[in-house]
UniProtKB/Swiss-Prot annotation:
Pfam families: Bombesin. The keyword Signal does not apply. GO terms for cellular component: extracellular space; secretory granule lumen. GO terms for biological process: neuropeptide signaling pathway; positive regulation of peptide hormone secretion; positive regulation of phospholipase C-activating G protein-coupled receptor signaling pathway. The lineage of its organism: Eukaryota, Metazoa, Chordata, Craniata, Vertebrata. The modification Methionine amide is found at residue 28. Belongs to the bombesin/neuromedin-B/ranatensin family. This is Gastrin-releasing peptide. Keywords: Amidation, Cytoplasmic vesicle, Secreted. Its main location: secreted. Stimulates the release of gastrin and other gastrointestinal hormones.
């Protein structure tokens, strides 16, 4: 999964390591 590079995606990567790309777009 393409993980977006950004400080806001750091905590999301811990919760959704395999879906951090949709998690960031989902919360934002």
């Amino acid at each position: 999964a393409p993980a977006p590079s950004g400080g806001g995606s750091a905590p999301l990567a811990k919760i959704y390591p395999r879906g951090s790309h949709w998690a960031v777009g989902h919360l934002m």
